[in-house]
Amino acid sequence: MLPATASRPSAEAETTACFSVHAAANPGIMPRVLELFAKRGLVPTSWTSRVGHEQDLMIDIQMQGMDGNLTDYVAACLRQIVGVEVVLVSEKRQSRAIET
C-alpha cells in the first residue's frame, strides 16, 4: 500500500529546438553548421540532410533540451554562414509526467 504522501504526477514540458537550414549545396556548409553545436558541447538529437532538385541543401536539426536564448543565438549564427539562404526555427514541447 502506498503511503498517504504518495507521489502524484505533474506536467513538465520538455522542449526540443528545431532548425531548418536551406543553403547552397556546398560540402563545406554541413561541417560549419555542425560546428555551432559541437563547440558548445552539444550533439544534435536528430540530423537529416538532403539535396533538392535545384541543387539546394536542406538540413533539419533537432536539439532536445535547448533553451530559448541559446536557440535564438544559434539561429542567428547559422544565418551568418556564407551560403546559408534561410534558417527557420520552431519549438516542440512534449509534456511528461513527473513523480513529485
Identify the meaning behind each predicted range:
Residues 1-100:
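A conserved regulatory-domain signal marking ACT and ACT-like small-molecule sensing domains
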